[in-house]
Amino acid sequence: MKIGSGEKLLFIGDSITDCGRARPEGEGSFGALGTGYVAYVVGLLQAVYPELGIRVVNKGISGNTVRDLKARWEEDVIAQKPDWVSIMIGINDVWRQYDLPFMKEKHVYLDEYEATLRSLVLETKPLVKGIILMTPFYIEGNEQDPMRRTMDQYGRVVKQIAEETNSLFVDTQAAFNEVLKTLYPAALAWDRVHPSVAGHMILARAFLREIGFEWVRSR
């Protein structure tokens, strides 16, 4: 288990991370962590590793791009003084290019995405024990689908930055691809973006695997 006793884990991202979390701080009980993968991760950490007392904060904001993360990074990440930061961003960076094709000011193209994400990781790396980079995803099994193809490019950037900075890497697209061998995309997300309960569990499982969570741990 890579996250240690009493350490603080902060999640940041878009609506997939947000999932109705409390404002201003997504921390605590009674739905404060939202209803998505963050809540599932916390539930399993508390159930299986209660002695670690890992503190979790959700700072996801629906609709965000990496550009938005940069604007709020100091307040929502650095000032929180986390031990670990998990970043999953990029879906809206890509999606706006397809659902709002003529509003180019909302598009975050690959070069800006890469430069901004790398800058945030490099700025934060010396201040924390570890960074976990999760790829954006598109719940579509056809790799030739235009938006899926673009999303894969952004995912490759995340992998490259993770390798460059020795960050943990969670390939969420690969996790979905495995389940898509059996299930139709609509079973996991009506719009191929916002996951169902099963979709969020896929994300949680992929995340937990990367941090060394032991599913068969006996206590």
UniProtKB/Swiss-Prot annotation:
Top-level class of the enzyme under EC nomenclature: hydrolase
Give the record's pathway.
Answer: Glycan degradation; xylan degradation
Places the protein is found: Cytoplasm
Result of altering Y184F? Significant reduction in catalytic activity and modification of the quaternary structure as a homodimer
Highest taxon of source: Bacteria
What EC number(s) does the entry state?
Answer: 3.1.1.72
Which residues does the UniProt site feature Transition state stabilizer point to?
G63, N92
Reaction(s) catalysed (UniProt annotation): Deacetylation of xylans and xylo-oligosaccharides
| CDD domains given in the database record | SGNH_hydrolase_like_2 (cd01834)
Biological process per Gene Ontology, one example term: xylan catabolic process
Q: Which UniProt keywords apply?
A: Carbohydrate metabolism, Cytoplasm, Hydrolase, Polysaccharide degradation, Serine esterase
> What turns on this gene?
Up-regulated by xylose.
The temperature profile of activity is: Optimum temperature is 50-60 degrees Celsius. Is stable at 60 degrees Celsius and loses most of its activity at 70 degrees Celsius.
- Catalytic residues at S15 (nucleophile), D191 (charge relay system), H194 (charge relay system)
**How does activity track with pH?**
Optimum pH is 7.1-9.2.
For whether the record's keyword set contains Hydrolase, the answer is: yes
Stored InterPro entries: Ester_Hydrolysis_Enzymes, SGNH_hydro, SGNH_hydro_sf
Q: Name one GO cellular component term.
A: cytoplasm
Is the keyword Cytoplasm assigned to this protein?
yes
Any Pfam family hit:
Lipase_GDSL_2
Q: Which family does it belong to?
A: Belongs to the 'GDSL' lipolytic enzyme family.
Instruction: Outline the subunit composition.
Output: Homooctamer, presenting a unique donut-shaped quaternary structure built of two staggered tetrameric rings. The eight active sites are organized in four closely situated pairs, which face the relatively wide internal cavity.
Kindly provide the name given to this protein in its UniProt entry. Answer: Acetylxylan esterase
Q: Which organism is it from?
A: Geobacillus stearothermophilus
Name of the encoding gene: axe2
